[in-house]
């Protein structure tokens, strides 16, 4: 039976644009120049919402882990607060990669990325733009905004339009953004309103959190237009897709279609809901598969032989 590697956690920050992203860097003790994995969360999520649980397991496997919070959220910089900009979040990923590469205590030639939900979509996009990376993990990934909107139904999309219109008016009038809930009960005008969305989101919040369940409504149209799954076919290195068979937020059928286009993709499927991935038995099964994948892809200093890739269903 393997013994978990001890690690230390450090509060860090890095520059992105004119602001800073806050993060936690997990360093495995006694490992010289370890490989690294960068973790980013989903829609409005911050690193306190269980990214630490994944990062700890990776560090225990001898892999350094950087879990960061996007600008405009949590303790990262950026004004106005609660602004979700896909362009800026992708720039945060670029900045995180550059920061890891520049550190002398990490192996710049062995870097992976890990994203969950909306961040899983970002990991697909970022992987397609950074061929120098070694591996990627896309956990219950958001792959197609149109498919997600259709899964919710047209009435749900229509309910958010008045709030979106008011937020765009606030831009013109230079007023504070008009907010919309990230997660809400079924039928509510929220970005996620599946039956498990609100309780699932709240289950990820640590005690005493100051997390705000809201985001500037102007993001809604850009989410619908965001289809990161389309670039999966451009990813040159191994990527692991962890797919929920009962996902209420990111339709699994569409995710699987895109995952099959990744030349070196691996697929793992789970009978657990979108928000179940972060806790309990589902988390244990998931993180075990992810540790195996990342260890396999990052431990060798030489490029993996493409013929050794495994596609599991």
PLM features: residue spans?
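Catalytic nucleophile-loop/oxyanion-hole region of alpha/beta-hydrolase
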Residues: 17, 47-50, 73-108, 112, ...
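The serine-hydrolase catalytic nucleophile loop
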Residues: 44-56, 70, 253
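Conserved alpha/beta-hydrolase
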Residues: 57-77
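Alpha/beta-hydrolase-fold enzymes
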Residues: 124-204
